[in-house]
Amino acid sequence: MAKKKLNSTIKRSRTRSGCVTCRDRHIKCDEQQPVCKNCQKSNRKCYRGIRLNFTQYTFYNPDDNKPKELQQNEQPNSSHYAFPNLEPNPVSQKHRILDQSITIASLYDDLKKYKPYIHLHTPEDLRESDLQFQEDTYNSYISTSAINLRGKKLTKRDPGLSTSLSVINPTLESEIKPNPVILNQLSFHPPPNLNTGVLYPPTATAATTTTSSPTNHHLHPYFVSSIPNPQHHPMLDTSQHQETTSTDPNQFDYSHLSMPQSTPLLMKYDITTYVRLIETEKYYMLLDLANELDIWKKIIPSLCLQISENDSFLLDCLMSCSRNTSVNLLDLTNEQLNKWSQLKNAPVISERIQQFEHILISIVLILLGLYLNTTKVRLTDYHKVIFNNQAKLFSHVLRKIHTFITSNKPNSAVLTNAIQSITMLKFFIDKNYDFSYEFKNIQKGRVTDTSEEITYSNSNLYSNPDISYISTFNEYEIIYLNNSYQNLVHVDQSNSMSMGESQLYKDLLWYLMKVDFVINYPEAANNLVLDHNVVYQQITNASTDLSFSNNLNYLNPRSYANYFLKEFIIKVLSMGSNAIIEDANNRINTLFNFIDQSYMDPELKSQFHHCFTWTVRYIHPVSD
């Protein structure tokens, strides 16, 4: 059979789709994507070039394709009474070729031969080149993965990709899209609507070593190296577009082009694991129900990244909340004790208060990580020891800083919220694992641990471990709960949030926690103050609120959480009345059904079941 002749008039260009690594080694690339076999065998970084050959460009001029009628209407001799052109007037843009030679050259031998030419490029062009390379690499990877993995089940695999310059290479199982909020956190720019005086008051800014100060914007190259935050603004009209100011050249930093960056933390965590923790797993959901600043979504991850340049402890604590990262809890808790040993005998002064704040943050993250990733069936005595020791350390820290934080207000919102979050987590942990029941019944008569020492190495701890600290309030928690933490919070913060749903959530939760403690430990609750008027109006309207069933699909997570707490308070205050308890249980089940059928993110649905199923499990009608 004769071969079909190719059309000689068609000019064909030779294309190269192999990786840059094989080309640099002068070997033939098998072109497997996203990682070629050569790089897999030799354990090398597989870079895939995006714009290596500047040969073909196509420009589109909108004026060339305008309808003739429109062009005639734009003639200067058109009628004075002609109708105005209602089509939007596009902003004229200059077409230019983006020179990415420096970005591509940085992949070859650390840019040694190209350093003399860096001064020929403006900082703006260099930055745009890096960002364009990042975007092209990301989009190319996602499209390739979508084709290769269509109809197949994703499996965990290390693709061997790593970061170079500002390039973020997602792992094979990643389905995460770029999120400006996450990129904003990576650069630790506090949200513009937050009052930095509330987050970090002036009294604590004179520290000699304020590791959490957001003044240093240099981050680890394994996360993002000198990438500006993408700012999303509404589309501007022509006049506004012309009035936009030019970019400040001082914000550009290209030190990575002149000197290699190396750090022992370079490959400790994959960037996609960090992004997935915030974007997909939404570890912060339960904690941020109690604050409208989204502290655990926006502030804490940025803080952990910021100080990890010198100390990765808080970042390790944060990553312990991830389902895809295995953090050694023994090493983590020992490091926590080492940091506490440096503070427990030190005087509490303004310059040192942030170090105590970091200890409190670590307690929150370790408790939360265990709570999210350990089911009741998988709970071991070792987990109980960690839970109890974290609560015990919390008691020691409060004893140390109580006088200072109550007499030197305002405290930072992070410090105050960390204290609140630990008490809240203790309550949810107690309900999830039934610690109060175990402490009152199984451990009844057992002498609780009264020593000041916190240890994880004593083998005797893992036989019928003590859970007294995680199950009960310490004296300082009782003081704070009695006045709803008003002796800690910033004055303006309490006023501005008084009408918010997060404040309602806290009012309901504080009341429920105190009532629950009085029921379980009446002998230890003499100092607790209960004000039933705080929630009386809320719970009396709870039974009628659910009549607006059509609106439940559009509620935010805080509204659902408030409904759960209201219904459980009704059950607690109505014990002995089977009809009321049964109606409350029916409404709670209705809430779960609405959540399952709503447009809520699937991860949030799962967390609601994990965090609030106890509202159904506790207190049922008593059969005659």
UniProtKB/Swiss-Prot annotation:
Keyword check for Transport: no
Listed Polar residues bias regions: 237-250
DNA-binding region: 19-46
Domain of life: Eukaryota
Knockout-associated phenotype: Stabilizes the opaque phase.
Function statement: Transcription factor that binds the promoters of genes involved in biofilm formation, which include several key adhesion genes, and recruits MCM1 to these sites. Plays an important role in hyphal growth and virulence. Promotes conversion of opaque cells to white phase, but needs existence of EFG1, a key regulator required for maintenance of the white state.
Subunit description: Interacts with MCM1.
UniProt protein name: Adhesion and hyphal regulator 1
Lineage: Eukaryota, Fungi, Dikarya, Ascomycota, Saccharomycotina
